[in-house]
């Protein structure tokens, strides 16, 4: 399912099987309800508008969303936002498959910002489970992630200030430039670093 502009899913049931991307809104993709199931060879949910900073986002507000992808589960050129619903993502064959030698198989990927502020999100990713080229904030909701690489990765800054975050499998569980944990519950399992920051780490509460 593809739109050259904005793509909205408000209700109903969608079962999509695609050799490439599952649902793609060029300008934006919003799921605000319904039951959405995607099995794709490429990215499951995608928005790739690259010439407007207010576009290129993927937003899940509500609904039941189940994604199985050969590529990324969610791929947003700007922001990826989850504020509600039940989201289940398996990308790249899952954590047991390991990081692919080519291509990207991340659970949630965004170039600017990732926000999780509600809902229940479960990710089983061959690559990073949650990956932002910019910053991310996990404010509320429940996130459970298994990864063949990093559990939660950000190039700039990560703020965990209320969500319940559990990384069950990873090489590095939480990696970023600046990392702040100020609230919530954070439980990390890794084969390498639990928390790795190239800048500073601030822990005020929440680390299990």
Predicted regions and their residues:
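Acidic/polar low-complexity surface segments
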Residues: 2-14, 20-207
